[in-house]
């Protein structure tokens, strides 16, 4: 199914994993079709928004029938590159880094953190959650050898930009940034910022102003 992702709103693209997870859940329950109303009620997203999101990708469903679960799953796997095993590296094995290594996408069979990096000599050479921890000096060599192009960044804030520069030199294409720093990278590298403090403040704001 041909579509130009450059013309699709970022908000739509960010909702695709939510749809995928929900449809996967329906599949595991033996459900073979779903309509936008059911998706709306489960994910708290307006039906009109769901239909508009899906319309960017062509005819995913039929009026009066809804969406076939198997067809949706096949589409989402292709759109999200989830039909392939994706190897990910993590840089910064502090408390958050250790937690992510232990979790290691346990509900996503296709995504796995396979390599970790740090500068602490007491950590380097050990394994955490079955993931080997390498020294930062070996970053580019290991990433290139393992053909890894996605990295989770959990370093201290002051080290984030320096490490980001190293990741760019290693031809990384995507960075999930858990540090408070707003790192600068070329347009060829996608960065998603996850600031837990901001997310919590946002939650508290909505609780205060929008709760019944």
From Swiss-Prot:
Residues 18-57 bind DNA. Its main location: cytoplasm. It comes from the Bacteria. Keywords: Cytoplasm, DNA-binding, NAD, Repressor, Transcription, Transcription regulation. GO terms for biological process: negative regulation of DNA-templated transcription; response to redox state. GO terms for molecular function: DNA binding; DNA-binding transcription factor activity. NAD(+) binds at residues 92-97. One of its GO terms (cellular component) is cytoplasm. The keyword Repressor applies. It is found in: Cytoplasm. Belongs to the transcriptional regulatory Rex family. Homodimer. Modulates transcription in response to changes in cellular NADH/NAD(+) redox state. This is Redox-sensing transcriptional repressor Rex. The lineage of its organism: Bacteria, Bacillati, Bacillota, Bacilli, Bacillales.
